[in-house]
């Protein structure tokens, strides 16, 4: 099969036909120049060999024009994004984080440890083979996969199974997906959290330098965005997801945050449209 060079442009249309909300589209237009500057800074860091990967995010804030009907939103997410994990964290009636995460950080149940590498993105209407053959997306994906390998080795877990890479759809976007699993006697969930988070799926490579530049480029505190969210039981079983594709309802406002991974071969316009589609993917469930 002919491989797609990272220098070539994969024809991607990130336009969504499932939401037509003038106010939200106006917010996207207003934020486009700022987002473009962020993405271009990220691309320059890659091209200057300062970083190998960086995940740049964008946040939109708008007033909630009525009481948040969380049950209805979760019902729509369950129908429209069956492959995602729906999550809610309610600190109080005026601070609620919710969403539909495509990414499992890890789970441990009945001696089976499962990790997921989820990175590399395309609109769900794009031919899956194009995503599987895109060198840019494979590079982005492999940074996450290799980080998981390194983390397992640091945890002295050297025997594991790597499932075949595939494409999974999450609403209007699809991702490259690789499962890694290992049968082990026991593992401390807090140790897994320490080693696995933040992965290159939400941060970058090298991690320390990427964190510095993310804090420099993004003008907001990520807060709950991209944090681990999950549970641990008394037997040590656990399941943690990455709190992305989500929103935060706080003080009668809604914050929606989404990001995109920038690597060698990234094209600014594609990254901007990818971020906007991710924002739209959740906004349509809230605003419709």
Where are these regions (language model features)?
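Contiguous alpha-helical scaffold segments within structured protein domains
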Residues: 2-33, 37-40, 63, 114-216, ...
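Hydrophobic pocket-lining residues that define ligand/cofactor binding sites across diverse proteins
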Residues: 46
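A short glycine-rich, hydrophobically flanked beta-strand micro-motif that places a catalytic Asp/Glu
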Residues: 54, 86-90, 223-230
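Short hydrophobic alpha-helical segments that form membrane-spanning helices or hydrophobic packing faces
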Residues: 55-59, 153
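An anion-binding catalytic pocket shared by soluble metabolic enzymes
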Residues: 58-143, 159, 236-259
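A glycine-rich phosphate-binding loop feature that marks nucleotide/adenosyl-phosphate handling sites
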Residues: 59-60, 91-97, 148-149, 164-173, ...
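Conserved hydrophobic core element of enzyme catalytic domains
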Residues: 180-288
């Amino acid at each position: 099969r002919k491989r797609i060079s990272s220098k070539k442009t994969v024809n991607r249309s990130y336009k969504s036909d499932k939401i037509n909300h003038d106010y939200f589209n106006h917010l996207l237009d207003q934020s486009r120049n700022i987002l473009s500057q962020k993405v271009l800074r990220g691309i320059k860091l890659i091209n200057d060999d300062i970083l190998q990967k960086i995940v740049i995010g964008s946040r939109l804030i708008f007033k909630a024009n009525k009481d948040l009907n969380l049950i209805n939103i979760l019902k729509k997410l369950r129908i429209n994004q069956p492959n995602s994990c729906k999550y809610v964290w309610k600190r109080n009636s005026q601070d609620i984080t919710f969403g539909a995460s495509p990414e499992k950080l890890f789970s441990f149940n009945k001696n089976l440890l499962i990790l997921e590498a989820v990175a590399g993105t395309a609109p769900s209407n794009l031919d899956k083979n194009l995503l599987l053959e895109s060198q840019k997306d494979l590079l982005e994906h492999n940074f996450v996969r290799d980080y998981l390998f390194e983390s397992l080795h640091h945890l002295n877990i050297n025997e594991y199974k790597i499932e075949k890479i595939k494409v999974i759809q999450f609403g209007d976007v699809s991702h490259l997906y690789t499962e890694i699993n290992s049968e082990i006697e026991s593992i401390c969930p807090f140790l897994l959290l320490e080693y696995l988070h933040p992965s290159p799926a939400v941060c970058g490579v090298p991690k320390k330098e990427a964190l510095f530049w993310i804090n420099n480029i993004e003008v907001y505190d990520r807060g709950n965005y991209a944090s681990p969210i999950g549970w641990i039981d008394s037997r040590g079983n656990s399941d943690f997801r990455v709190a992305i594709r989500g929103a935060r309802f706080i003080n009668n406002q809604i914050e929606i945050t989404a990001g995109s991974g920038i690597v060698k071969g990234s094209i600014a316009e594609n990254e901007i449209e990818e971020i906007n589609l991710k924002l739209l993917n959740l906004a349509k469930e809230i605003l419709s």
